[in-house]
């Protein structure tokens, strides 16, 4: 099993500063370039001029339609993609640390499937965005509770039981989603549910930026404030208890924060899978397993990753590809590789 406990491989402060600068530059450049990418292309110079025109008295040299595309269509979409990527990456890093398991993520342990059912049910009965995020959070938390309860053996959650419990729980909630689609109005509710479930930022707006931003930032801040406790949990329950940590309470605080993040992303963008599983591994390669550094690094990398995935989704072909399809195509092979590597190291023993 891959150790997720803090070690001495984390970068020294000077290298850490360089890492933050590089990631922040990449994030800013990614957002800037993405504002010009799409079926209606806008040059980088015009994008910069449009943005500066909001704060400086610049004579417009761009077309009004370019300004509308950049500020009203692409900007909220990119902000939502960045928030979703950062939130899911933070959630995945937190779950992997809490469970001492590099193979878990919001989708693997059933949170996404539970939130998907809650969201689909909310769409079926109402058009309220508040109900959508509330139902997604409630059922996402319920799914996590079921998985965690089933997977516990002799006072701990084993890797094998955790993955299997996640598969079972995901299958159950997927069946409930299928029932919801079966009874939905085929001319109204069904298309809305199906398109939403595939994951997309096409319906982005500044209202949705607020919808996803408040819970994602709140949940991510809770996780970050718990980073030292997650480091201790990564040592194991017995070691954590011997150091005076209240293991169950700490774990549940983190789990509630993760469920809030996942539910907000599902409510705003549908199912965007595999980000929370894959991105923490790449972040860990750069920072080591110390969550003091890992969590913010995962957030930045996740934001950059999902921004570029969305670029591919909306610019590769004439018809927009759902983001969830692309993340699954990229994430599933990585998960298969991780499973194989863990199996070779005797993953069933933990």
Locations of regions flagged by a protein language model:
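Alpha-helical transmembrane segments in inner-membrane proteins
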Residues: 2-350
